[in-house]
Amino acid sequence: MKSFKNFYIRNNNLVQLQNTSFESPLITTNSYVYYGDLSLAQKQNFKWIAGGNSLLPQGPILINDTTVWGFTVPFPSGNQCLALQSTSFIEQSMYMTTGLHTISFYYHTRTGDSGNPINIVIDNSIIGTTSSVAVNSWTFFSQTFTTLISGNVIVKLEGTLSTTTGIDNIIVV
């Protein structure tokens, strides 16, 4: 368990994570699209800030019910998931109260890849990392942490290696 002293209040509005199963924007069934190829309207509907990945187009990959990326279908929640390829990332602001919290999600290594560990980052502090061992099915990950001050924080998931890992159904309580 990790504690944080450097959280700060950005505003007093209650904010929760949005689009945690990546169902928006809806893309064509049996397809995928890189974040860098989304239209401005699609990026706004995505709700996450995304980037990274030195490959072009940049950013993570939104996937709808296809096995092309080597992830087991069905996905844990809904018809879409997100793949963090190389050092791509997603981040979003949310409100957290003082106390104990848990972040959880499902992850899956791309078939044929070694694991791409995913760092879980809260306001620039890594609070956990998924296993570096390749997993060929959707695997549940959970990390508990403590916040010492209530306020809005940045929740970020980021790839660390040059391989690909799918994620879905992010929950923070």
Language-model segments: residues:
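Aromatic (Trp/Tyr/Phe) and Gly/Pro-enriched flexible surface segments
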Residues: 2-100, 104, 111-121, 138-148, ...
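Surface-exposed loop/edge segments in extracytoplasmic proteins
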Residues: 124-130
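A short, sequence-level motif marking secondary-structure junctions
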Residues: 131-136
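Σ70-family region 2.3-2.4 aromatic/basic alpha-helix that recognizes the −10 promoter
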Residues: 154
